[in-house]
Amino acid sequence: MKGITFFTPFLSFLYLLCILFMTETEAGSRNGDGVYIVYMGSASSAANANRAQILINTMFKRRANDLLHTYKHGFSGFAARLTAEEAKVIAKKPGVVSVFPDPHFQLHTTHSWDFLKYQTSVKVDSGPPSSASDGSYDSIVGILDTGIWPESESFNDKDMGPIPSRWKGTCMEAKDFKSSNCNRKIIGARYYKNPDDDSEYYTTRDVIGHGSHVSSTIAGSAVENASYYGVASGTAKGGSQNARIAMYKVCNPGGCTGSSILAAFDDAIADGVDVLSLSLGAPAYARIDLNTDPIAIGAFHAVEQGILVICSAGNDGPDGGTVTNTAPWIMTVAANTIDRDFESDVVLGGNKVIKGEGIHFSNVSKSPVYPLIHGKSAKSADASEGSARACDSDSLDQEKVKGKIVLCENVGGSYYASSARDEVKSKGGTGCVFVDDRTRAVASAYGSFPTTVIDSKEAAEIFSYLNSTKDPVATILPTATVEKFTPAPAVAYFSSRGPSSLTRSILKPDITAPGVSILAAWTGNDSSISLEGKPASQYNVISGTSMAAPHVSAVASLIKSQHPTWGPSAIRSAIMTTATQTNNDKGLITTETGATATPYDSGAGELSSTASMQPGLVYETTETDYLNFLCYYGYNVTTIKAMSKAFPENFTCPADSNLDLISTINYPSIGISGFKGNGSKTVTRTVTNVGEDGEAVYTVSVETPPGFNIQVTPEKLQFTKDGEKLTYQVIVSATASLKQDVFGALTWSNAKYKVRSPIVISSESSRTN
């Protein structure tokens, strides 16, 4: 019987190979219906690796061009052009975890480090670079993005030591990118073929700017007098100037393919990075499951190898349930404003000043001498009033607009000042004032055409002026940089919000960080951001959770340098439990509307750039925690075993596995779902002492939401040595039925440390998709 049991899967495998061979013979060398990813679990399994290689050899012997990527370092599998029938057959093969169409992902598109320094009253990594922050370890940050512009001064390697000997990566050459473009700062550069791109020319050089911006935010060398044509002038520097950069170019102007992202994860694991930073993700509506999400799959195997994976939360806010990249082994980052504002005010007749926001470089008069008109009053004959109010494309009459400043409104929620500007400019207008409560706090660059954004409260004054004045006039003032702007931080309107569609029992996002109007390196030849008659700017100011994630990646890199033996979950815990919840007005962090931010907006709070270096206690989420999560989520042991590199020999899914038990994995935040208010719920957490060599005592305090009782036992944790682990229980009960999600926190503290965990309690079921 044992022999039959052993050979049955293998015979089935051979049978399927025969079918595939016949399918391949019929298909010949033609292209398949589409690109599919075949995920076969951990590369540590010899059986999986052999099956993958046999399958590749059989299928693509005469179709080499259809095989796009093979995955063999951190996990097994491949990406290839297949027919739908071939994909179905492969999906039934023993050892195959999933087969799915290659998905497309989108990008989530200086002073910010000084703001974090001010907020936490600590020194950010701003001194001269050395070989390592603590003299013993160089951290290597892998970045999956659009490439890098190596000539930028932000990537000079002055005073940096030799490349770490453990580095196994490479610097791939192209026509415009030579091995000499890599140095002791940029130590690795790889590019990946996009199956949708027929071009034969590939390079790691950044032609978009996004990857260079992200890279310099993380690890850029200090560059004095950096600015965007004089705006945001100062010293541009990365948060971890000692870190090394390894660029994995997975995105081009057409987007980022999942097959390339997985290939980059596979290479990065083999190359030896310490941190992986991804400022990209799926759209909020995609609702991708774990075993068909290349980012979740790649991150799972990276974390198994001790690599922390940090991802942007997405730019689909402010609606709830829009956060992406929410697997529990990923650190998910929201975006907030900083204490710098770019004002471009509107001056009305009578010199009444209306505050506005925008970056432009116009030379219009500072006196209000230009006629002012509302978009609806300038509508073309064929346009609707609503379209004209928004200054939508082809909605305005050129004769009515010429020489005037036009007031436009975001009436549909999907239009932006840049599109209104283009319409006004094309019809001969002098300037554009755009009304939008959401984007008012996020400065965008509008080139040389006068454009500014105001909110509805400010717009009411302009409407009153228009209605009471026969010949209304106005002007738009040049951009002025305002420092020490208050209140800051505030969660950016675009930042995707929780709860996670994956599970409410894991709070997402994890943290928030600066992501609004961030100055960083750019490509050196981008005419689209250049001013007429001036050379291309080497730096650019942009916003997005794309800009927030690299701030966290930089701090994670610093922590890794100071604590090289810490694993990914310890670093994540250090960042989350030391986050701040207050702004520079000493009030609580708010959203773009002024409402107090909840953990669904900001996670544990705003990144603290150096308090996280010494957190006192950490929550270590173990491999078993993640395996149990997969059990609770509904995966069977066979699938989990195929996925895991370090699958314990005696591991089995708990007999009572269910979604509610996800709350029990050792995460730095506490999410309790499916709680209607009846009875009580208990979760357990374990903390590790990393702050003291000797004795340490911590006392708990609880921020309890109204209508609830939260009991923590024990109320004191007494550690006797460094590295000691202690466990506590949190028992939640309610005095009334739960009608909406509520928020609280618990903090373990002593005279030296405060270790805070947010708490979210929901009546909704754990899984919402």
UniProtKB/Swiss-Prot annotation:
Q: Which GO terms describe its cellular component?
A: apoplast
Induction field: Induced by high CO(2).
Catalytic residues of the enzyme = D145 (charge relay system), H210 (charge relay system), S546 (charge relay system)
Keyword Protease listed: yes
Chain ranges of the PA domain: 381-465
Give its localization.
Secreted, Cell wall
Q: From what superkingdom does this record's organism come? A: Eukaryota
- Signal sequence residues: 1-27
Family, as annotated: Belongs to the peptidase S8 family.
Primary location class: secreted
Q: Gene that codes for this?
A: CRSP
Name by which UniProt lists this protein = CO(2)-response secreted protease
Phenotype on deletion? Increased stomata number at elevated CO(2) concentration and increased number of epidermal cells.
Give the EC number: 3.4.14.10
Q: If you read the UniProt record, what top EC class would you report for this enzyme, in one word?
A: hydrolase
One GO BP on record is: negative regulation of defense response to bacterium
Organism whose genome encodes this protein? Arabidopsis thaliana (Mouse-ear cress)
Domain Peptidase S8: from-to ranges: 112-613
* GO MF annotations, alphabetized: serine-type endopeptidase activity; serine-type peptidase activity; tripeptidyl-peptidase activity
What this protein is reported to do is described as: Mediates CO(2)-controlled stomatal development by cleaving peptide EPF2 (AC Q8LC53). Not active on peptides EPF1 (AC Q8S8I4) or stomagen (AC Q9SV72).
User: Inhibitor I9 domain: which residues?
Assistant: 35-108
| Tissues and organs where the protein is expressed, per its UniProt entry | Expressed in roots, guard cells and meristemoid and pavement cells.
Give the catalytic activity.
Release of an N-terminal tripeptide from a polypeptide
Family annotation (PROSITE patterns): SUBTILASE, SUBTILASE_HIS, SUBTILASE_SER
